[in-house]
């Protein structure tokens, strides 16, 4: 493959999207209006919440949907597709509607993150790319959020580019990590493309290039006096690394009146080393010197280090963030929820499974989030039919759809719709926020979740309930074996 060739992301689809599309056209179903939902079934790492991310890339993709002459020639060469279908693809573009939760929104299992309303072939062909972006970026944003909360207000930087699973994994992973709370990245191109602050200082190779560790530290301080963070574990952290860093600071920075500087550990017993280093630095008068640590960290290890009293100001987190190593699959799915008949009536559809967790919620839906007026905290999410409204001036009884005897009456609450219009009739109607706005929004929304939902171990199951009307339709479809009545 020519590495300079620009790939057409329209072709980034599972092959069965095309075979189904050809079949829809063959049976004159290409214009049938369909409703698909993107949702996930469980939170990674047995957590209490996830963070939605990836919408900006989906918007760009939808706006650029098309098939090139080369694409058509390739498909013709497969000898599976009719000429009528290939002609259809020549003028292919998206004309449907899309609703989505804003990026940075905390989300929960089985509620729609995206709803697509479009003609059958269009809705089918976008499935793969929508899932790819939502699954990847939501996974990394969620992992970053957990790691940043474990750091208890300390700076977290994303350091994982070299361990990422491909270029997009590094570039978009850094973007998602920033949404989830990371302060910056080591990935330069993510700064160039998205404005994710890129930073870094030195590797062990810098130290090894000089005749001595002290010479390496002096040289770095001379070149970057206002950004001198020295890697102190190339040889012996406490016997040479920290003492040589202090000496370089004294010789180069102190005469310049610079007191802000840093050291970094990338190996060893981090809790022990940082406590010893902090005392050495303070005793030498470098109380403003910051200590950064890296070395295969994640939220569990960071929490453990802080429980042990580690003296750390910032964390560089690499492979276990950028690959979400502990649970590297988000598990989002794209399922048909309804179709329209020739008169425009919405016909609900359901997927039935022996596994109760895989039974889908039918129909064209919307999602509300309820906030307590007393505390400002999120109390529950509520999935209802698209034409149902919630009167938040009246008490509302909600129930667990899997255990309907579990009920709760909400009073004194405000209701907010989570799904917002993104495309109408194929035209973008959504004002894309900046990445900093998304990050700030994410932090604000996380602050509305109770600590019981946020905790790492055995978090509270946040309420995601169905309206009575939606639950009845679901049960009727289940009792009818999935077949819509009428």
Predicted regions and their residues:
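Gly/Ser/Thr/Ala-enriched C-terminal appendages of enzymes
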Residues: 1-32, 36, 41, 45-47, ...
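Buried, small/hydrophobic-residue-enriched core segments of structured protein domains
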Residues: 1-34, 42-44, 80, 86-95, ...
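N-terminal, Lys/Arg-enriched amphipathic/low-complexity engagement segments
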Residues: 34-90, 99
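Short coil/turn segments at secondary-structure boundaries
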Residues: 73-74, 142-146, 160, 454-461
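Short, positively charged
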Residues: 78-86, 166, 394-402
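Hydrophobic residues within beta-strands of alpha/beta enzymes
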Residues: 199, 263, 291, 313-315
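Residue-level "edge-of-site" marker
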Residues: 204, 294, 318
């Amino acid at each position: 493959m020519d590495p300079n060739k620009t790939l057409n992301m329209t072709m980034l689809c599972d092959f069965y999207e095309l075979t189904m599309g050809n079949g829809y056209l063959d049976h004159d179903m290409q214009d049938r209006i369909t409703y698909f939902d993107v949702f996930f079934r469980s939170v990674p790492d047995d957590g209490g919440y996830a963070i939605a991310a990836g919408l900006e890339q989906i918007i760009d993709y939808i706006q650029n949907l098309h098939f090139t002459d080369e694409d058509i020639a390739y498909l013709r060469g497969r000898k599976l597709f009719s000429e009528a279908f290939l002609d259809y693809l020549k003028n292919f573009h998206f004309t449907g509607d899309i609703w989505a939760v804003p990026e940075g929104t905390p989300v929960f299992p089985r509620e729609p993150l995206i709803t697509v309303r479009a003609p059958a072939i269009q809705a089918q062909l976008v499935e793969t790319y929508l899932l790819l972006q939502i699954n990847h970026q939501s996974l990394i944003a969620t992992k970053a959020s957990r790691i940043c909360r474990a750091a208890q207000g300390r700076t977290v930087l994303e350091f994982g580019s070299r361990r990422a699973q491909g270029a997009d994994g590094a570039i978009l992973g850094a973007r998602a990590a920033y949404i989830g709370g990371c302060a910056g990245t080591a990935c330069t191109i993510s700064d160039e493309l998205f404005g994710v602050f890129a930073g870094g200082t030195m590797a062990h190779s810098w130290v090894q290039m000089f005749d001595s560790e002290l010479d390496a530290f002096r040289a770095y301080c001379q070149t970057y006096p206002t950004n001198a963070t020295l890697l102190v574990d190339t040889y012996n952290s406490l016997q040479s690394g920290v003492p040589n860093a202090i000496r370089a600071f004294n010789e180069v920075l102190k005469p310049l009146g610079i007191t802000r500087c840093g050291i970094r550990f990338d190996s060893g017993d981090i809790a022990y080393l940082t406590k010893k280093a902090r005392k050495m630095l303070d005793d030498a008068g470098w109380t403003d010197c910051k200590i950064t640590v890296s070395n295969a960290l994640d939220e569990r290890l960071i929490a453990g280090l802080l429980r042990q009293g580690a003296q750390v100001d910032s964390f560089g987190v690499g492979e276990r963030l950028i690959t979400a190593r502990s649970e590297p699959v988000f598990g989002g799915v794209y399922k048909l929820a309804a179709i329209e008949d020739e008169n425009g009536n919405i016909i609900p559809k359901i997927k039935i499974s022996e596994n109760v967790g895989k039974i889908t919620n039918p129909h064209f839906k919307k999602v509300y989030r309820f906030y307590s007026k007393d505390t400002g905290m999120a109390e529950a999410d509520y999935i209802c039919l698209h034409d149902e409204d919630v009167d938040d001036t009246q008490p509302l009884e909600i129930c667990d759809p899997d255990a309907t005897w579990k009920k709760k009456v909400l009073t004194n609450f405000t209701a907010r719709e989570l799904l917002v219009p993104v495309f109408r009739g194929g035209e973008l109607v959504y004002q894309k926020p900046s990445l900093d706005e998304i990050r700030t929004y994410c932090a604000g929304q996380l602050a509305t979740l109770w600590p019981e939902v946020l905790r790492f171990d055995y978090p509270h199951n946040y309420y995601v309930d169905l309206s009575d009307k939606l639950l009845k339709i679901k049960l009727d479809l289940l009792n009818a074996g999935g077949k819509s009545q009428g």
